[in-house]
Swiss-Prot record:
CDD domains the UniProt entry points to: ANTH_N_AP180 (cd16985)
Protein name according to UniProt: Phosphatidylinositol-binding clathrin assembly protein LAP
ENTH domain location: 16-158
Superkingdom assignment: Eukaryota
Subcellular locations according to the entry: Membrane, Clathrin-coated pit; Golgi apparatus; Cytoplasmic vesicle, Clathrin-coated vesicle
Organism: Drosophila melanogaster (Fruit fly)
GO biological process, alphabetically ordered: chemical synaptic transmission; clathrin coat assembly; clathrin-dependent endocytosis; clathrin-dependent synaptic vesicle endocytosis; neuron-neuron synaptic transmission; phototaxis; positive regulation of clathrin-dependent endocytosis; receptor-mediated endocytosis
Keywords, sorted A to Z: Coated pit, Cytoplasmic vesicle, Endocytosis, Golgi apparatus, Membrane
Residue spans of biased composition, Acidic residues class: 459-468
One Pfam family recorded for the sequence: ANTH
Region listing for Disordered, in residue ranges: 438-468
Task performed by this protein: Assembly protein recruiting clathrin and adaptor protein complex 2 (AP2) to cell membranes at sites of coated-pit formation and clathrin-vesicle assembly. May be required to determine the amount of membrane to be recycled, possibly by regulating the size of the clathrin cage. Involved in AP2-dependent clathrin-mediated endocytosis at the neuromuscular junction.
Length: 468
C-alpha cells in the first residue's frame, strides 16, 4: 500500500526519525524511499548542503547511506548508491575524503533481490523486477568502491581535476608519476565500463539516473585519460627501456578502452542524450603504434621485421605525411622505394671505393698510392720519371730508390713533422699528382699549378668538365 507514491514503511521510518530529532537520518530516508523513481532533487540538494556545513558529521552521513544499502529492497539499495554518487560528484570534498580513508565500503558483491517480483517493478508499467536489477546494483557498487580507492591512491578525484593542454594536471605530470597514475585511472574506468547496460535495460527512473551519473563520470574520466596518454606519447621517445615498455603497454590498453567507451556512448545516444554532449572519438593512425613498437625494439636491441619497419626513422610519435605515404602496411616496404634505396647505397659504395683504392689500370695513381702506403710490408719499386709527394717520408728530398729500400712504417714513431719539408720547399707545389682519370670515371684530378692549393680537388663529370 502506498500513499502519495511513498510506502507505509517510508512514512513510518521518516516519522520515527522526526520524533527522535534525527534530521539528517530523515533526509537520507526521504532520498532513499521504496518508490521506483530516482531520488528527488530537493532531497539531494539538502544533503549536498549538509556536506558543506561544518556542524554536520560527514562520517554519520556516510554511515547512514551505507546502512540503507543493506536493505533487502533493490530500490532502496540502488537509491542509496545513487545518493552517494551524487554527493561524491557535487558535495564537499570532505565526503569523498572520508569514504577514501574509511574501511566502510559497499559490500554488495553478492546482492540479489529475489522478493520484488511484482508486476512492472513497484507499480511502474514496463519496469524491471528486482532480480534483473541486482547485477547492475553489484556493478554500480563496485564502481563506487573503485572511485574511492582511486581517491585514496591519488589524493584527488579524476573527475574534478583540471583538463586541457594549458592547465591539465595529467598534461603537466612528469613521466615517472604519469606511469603510476594511469593504471589507477584505467582501473576506475574499467569498473565503470563493466556496468555494461543496453538501451532496453534503462527501463525505470532509478537505473536511468545512475546511468546519467555514470555518463557524466565517463566523459570526465576519458578526457583526463586522453590528456595522460598525450603527455605519455610526448615523453615516450625520451624514456629509458623499462619506462618505454610500460608506456607502450598503457597505450595498447588505451586503444582497447577506446572501443569500449565508444560502445557506452552509443547506448547514451540511443537513450536520447544530446549528441553535442557526446564526444567524437577519433582513433590515432596505426602507424603511430608501429613507430612506438619500433622505438622499443631499438632500445631492447631486437630486430624489427621489414613489414613493421618504416624506411625513415622518426624522432616523433607523429611521422610526416611523406614518410607515411612511403610505408605500405599490407605489403611491407614498397618495391620501387626499396630498389631506389639499394641503388643509392650501391652508388655511394662505388664512389667510396674509387676514392680509397684505385684500379690497376689507373697507372701512376695506383703506383703512387702503393708507394706512399706506410702499412705495406714490401712496397713496390718506384717508377722512374714520376715525382711523388711522400707525406709519410722523413724529407721531400729523399730519392724514390731509398724510399723503396726502407719500410715507411719504421719511421712512424719519429716525432718530427713529416709535412714541414714539403711546405718549406721553394717550388710551392712543384710536385704534381697525376691522378687524372678518363672522362666520366668519377676519379679526382689536381692541376698542381703554382699558387693553387694541393687540396683543391675537382670531380670530373660525365661531359669531361670539372664540377664545382
Amino acid at each position: 500500500m502506498t500513499m502519495a507514491g511513498q510506502t507505509i514503511n517510508d512514512r513510518l521510518l521518516a516519522a520515527r526519525h522526526s520524533l527522535a530529532g534525527q534530521g539528517l537520518a530523515k533526509s537520507v530516508c526521504k532520498a532513499t524511499t521504496e518508490e521506483c523513481i530516482g531520488p528527488k532533487k530537493k532531497h539531494l540538494d539538502y544533503l549536498v548542503h549538509c556536506t558543506n556545513e561544518p556542524n554536520v558529521s560527514i562520517p554519520h552521513l556516510a554511515n547512514l547511506l551505507i546502512e540503507r544499502s543493506q536493505n533487502a529492497n533493490w530500490v532502496v539499495v540502488y537509491k542509496s548508491l545513487i545518493t552517494t554518487h551524487h554527493l561524491m560528484a557535487y558535495g564537499n570534498e570532505r565526503f569523498m575524503q572520508y569514504l577514501a580513508s574509511s574501511n566502510s565500503t559497499f559490500n554488495l558483491s553478492s546482492f540479489l533481490d529475489k522478493g520484488t517480483v511484482q508486476d512492472g517493478g513497484m507499480g511502474v508499467p514496463g519496469g524491471r523486477m528486482g532480480y534483473d536489477m541486482s547485477p547492475f546494483i553489484r556493478r554500480y557498487a563496485k564502481y563506487l568502491n573503485e572511485k574511492s580507492l582511486s581517491y585514496r591512491a591519488m589524493a584527488f578525484d579524476f573527475c574534478k581535476v583540471k583538463r586541457g593542454k594549458e592547465e591539465g594536471s595529467l598534461r603537466s605530470m612528469n613521466a615517472e608519476k604519469l606511469l603510476k597514475t594511469l593504471p589507477v585511472l584505467q582501473a576506475q574506468l574499467d569498473a565503470l565500463l563493466e556496468f555494461d547496460c543496453q538501451s532496453n535495460d534503462l527501463s525505470n527512473g532509478v537505473i536511468n539516473m545512475s546511468f546519467m551519473l555514470l555518463f557524466r563520470d565517463l566523459i570526465r574520466l576519458f578526457a583526463c585519460y586522453n590528456d595522460g596518454i598525450i603527455n605519455l606519447l610526448e615523453k615516450y621517445f625520451d624514456m629509458n627501456k623499462k619506462h618505454a615498455r610500460d608506456a607502450l603497454d598503457l597505450y595498447k590498453k588505451f586503444l582497447v578502452r577506446m572501443d569500449r567507451v565508444g560502445e557506452f556512448l552509443k547506448v547514451a545516444e540511443n537513450v536520447g542524450i544530446d549528441k553535442g554532449d557526446i564526444p567524437d572519438l577519433t582513433k590515432a593512425p596505426s602507424s603511430l603504434l608501429d613507430a612506438l613498437e619500433q622505438h622499443l625494439a631499438t632500445l631492447e636491441g631486437r630486430k624489427v621485421s621489414a613489414a613493421n619497419t618504416p624506411t625513415q626513422s622518426s624522432s616523433s610519435a607523429f611521422g610526416t605525411a611523406a614518410a607515411s605515404s612511403k610505408f605500405d602496411t599490407t605489403n611491407g616496404i614498397d618495391e620501387q622505394l626499396k630498389a631506389q634505396v639499394l641503388a643509392e647505397e650501391e652508388a655511394a659504395m662505388n664512389q667510396y671505393k674509387s676514392k680509397v683504392s684505385s684500379p690497376t689500370s689507373s697507372g701512376a695513381a695506383g703506383a703512387s698510392a702503393a708507394l706512399t702506403n706506410p702499412f705495406l710490408s714490401s712496397p713496390p719499386a718506384a717508377q722512374a720519371g714520376q715525382p711523388i709527394v711522400d707525406l709519410f717520408g722523413a724529407a721531400s728530398a729523399q730519392p724514390a730508390a731509398a724510399a723503396a729500400a726502407t719500410k715507411a712504417s719504421d719511421d712512424l714513431l719519429q716525432l718530427g713533422n713529416p709535412f714541414a719539408d714539403m711546405f718549406d720547399a721553394s717550388g710551392g707545389g712543384a710536385a704534381a699528382v697525376g691522378a687524372t682519370g678518363n672522362a666520366g670515371d668519377g676519379t679526382a684530378k689536381y692541376d698542381g699549378g703554382a699558387g693553387s692549393s694541393p687540396f683543391d680537388w675537382g670531380a670530373t663529370d660525365d661531359d669531361g668538365g670539372a664540377a664545382q
